[in-house]
């Protein structure tokens, strides 16, 4: 410990000795210049007195810091984390301003470590919960497909076209579930997966509507797309944004009144430096008490209790993706009258691309 202490202050010691030597030289030259004979005793006194005071000062400083430095060394050898060290140092009063700064920094690092560890643990728990829910939801299409195959083998199934249609429905559920699971896994490495680009928003939306065309026809819902006369170019990641809009369209399809010919209105508008994409349905709406929580992970609310396909992850993932792309996503709804989901793109988009 003493060796380390002296090595850390070697520069100060050397410059102090150099200063004493310089003082002796100046005194010697002054005496010689005056014509007197320098006394060895006086010269030694000039050397010994400052040297003794310097040594005494370092000794006092070492004694003052010894207990704290010994304690820190012991903590460094035994503590399991930086937060353990930080908590322990809080109970040990620093002796110097430098020690106080180091203690403050270690405490800050410990808090940062705990925060990141807690975030990681929550992500793992969330991933585990979602995986369990996903497996549970996927059991239904597996069971249905198995039953359909058995009926086909026994010759008790309905007509072949109906059989294929039912099989396609279950396959669609599989596709949607697998896509959500894949995007959940990719979200953890979002910053490495995102690819900013400029593209036509209306063309992307038309493509997604065509992709869900069969669902619109089956549920007797009619999409209408309203776009400005000029092409609307936005900067974003098209793959991730497509996932977000697909989730919003899927929710609009799922929670609209089925088979009555209601419209689902998709509207693109530009206002100054902002572009808005809204998807409005005339479905069952969201209860007021549930609206503030619809973007929380695993929250299904009152409507989720009546919808077997609800996982509580679709809108959560959509919100997370929009936040990381620098877009805003919010919902407006009136129970029994429908819901409007809106994405806002601003001129400073893609400025918050970070990992979860």
From Swiss-Prot:
One cellular-component annotation, GO = plasma membrane
Q: Which residues carry this modification: Phosphohistidine?
A: 136
SMART domains the UniProt entry points to? HATPase_c
Membrane topology value: Multi-pass membrane protein
Q: What InterPro entries is this protein classified in?
A: 2-comp_sensor_kinase (IPR050351), HATPase_C_sf (IPR036890), His_kinase_dom (IPR005467), HisK_dim/P_dom (IPR003661), Sig_transdc_His_kin-like_C (IPR004358)
Transmembrane spans? 12-32, 43-63
User: GO molecular function terms here?
Assistant: ATP binding; histidine phosphotransfer kinase activity; phosphorelay sensor kinase activity
* Keyword annotations: ATP-binding, Cell membrane, Kinase, Membrane, Nucleotide-binding, Phosphoprotein, Transferase, Transmembrane, Transmembrane helix, Two-component regulatory system
Cross-referenced Gene3D superfamilies, in alphabetical order? Answer: Histidine kinase-like ATPase, C-terminal domain
Q: Is the keyword Cell membrane in the record?
A: yes
Question: Histidine kinase domain location, by residue?
Answer: 133-349
The places in or outside the cell where this protein is found are: Cell membrane
Query: What is the protein's species of origin?
Result: Bacillus subtilis (strain 168)
Task: Give ranges for the Extracellular compartment.
Answer: 33-42
Enzyme Commission identifier(s) = 2.7.13.3
The record ties this protein, via PROSITE patterns, to: HIS_KIN
A single BP term in Gene Ontology: phosphorelay signal transduction system
Q: What class of enzyme is it?
A: transferase
Q: Which reaction does it catalyse?
A: ATP + protein L-histidine = ADP + protein N-phospho-L-histidine
Instruction: Return the protein name.
Output: Sensor histidine kinase YvcQ
Q: Summarize the protein's role.
A: Member of the two-component regulatory system YvcQ/YvcP. Probably activates YvcP by phosphorylation.
Cytoplasmic face residues: 1-11, 64-356
């Amino acid at each position: 410990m003493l060796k380390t202490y002296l090595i850390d202050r070697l520069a100060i010691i050397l410059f102090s000795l150099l200063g004493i030597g310089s003082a002796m030289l100046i005194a010697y030259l002054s005496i010689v210049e005056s014509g007197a004979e320098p006394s060895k005793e006086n010269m030694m006194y000039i050397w010994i007195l400052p040297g003794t005071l310097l040594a005494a000062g370092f000794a006092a400083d070492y004694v003052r810091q010894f207990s704290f430095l010994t304690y820190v060394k012991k903590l460094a050898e035994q503590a399991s984390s930086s937060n353990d060290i930080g908590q322990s140092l809080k109970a040990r009063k620093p002796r110097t301003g430098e020690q106080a700064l180091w203690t403050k920094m270690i405490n800050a690092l410990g808090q940062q470590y705990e925060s990141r560890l807690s975030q990681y643990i929550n992500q793992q728990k969330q991933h585990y919960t979602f995986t369990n829910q996903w497996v549970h939801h996927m059991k239904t299409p597996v069971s249905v497909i198995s039953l359909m195959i058995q009926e086909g083998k026994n010759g008790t199934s309905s007509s072949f076209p109906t059989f294929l249609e039912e099989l396609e429905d279950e396959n669609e559920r599989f596709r949607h579930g697998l896509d959500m699971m894949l995007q959940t896994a990719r979200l953890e490495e979002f910053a490495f997966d995102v690819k900013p680009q400029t593209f036509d928003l209306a063309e992307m939306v038309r493509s997604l509507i065509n992709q869900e065309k069969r669902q619109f026809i089956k549920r007797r819902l009619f999409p209408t797309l309203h776009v400005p006369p000029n092409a609307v170019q936005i900067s974003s990641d098209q793959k991730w944004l497509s996932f977000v809009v697909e989730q919003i369209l899927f929710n609009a399809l799922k929670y609209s009144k089925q088979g009555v010919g209601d419209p689902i209105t998709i509207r693109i508008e530009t206002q100054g430096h902002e572009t808005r994409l809204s998807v409005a349905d005339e479905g069952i709406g969201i209860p007021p008490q549930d609206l503030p929580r619809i973007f929380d992970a695993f929250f299904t609310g009152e409507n989720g209790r009546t919808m077997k396909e609800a996982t509580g992850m679709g809108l959560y993932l959509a919100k997370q993706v929009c936040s990381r792309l620098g877009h805003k996503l919010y919902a407006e709804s009136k129970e029994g009258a429908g819901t409007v989901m809106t994405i806002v793109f601003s001129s400073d988009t893609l400025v918050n691309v970070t990992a979860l």
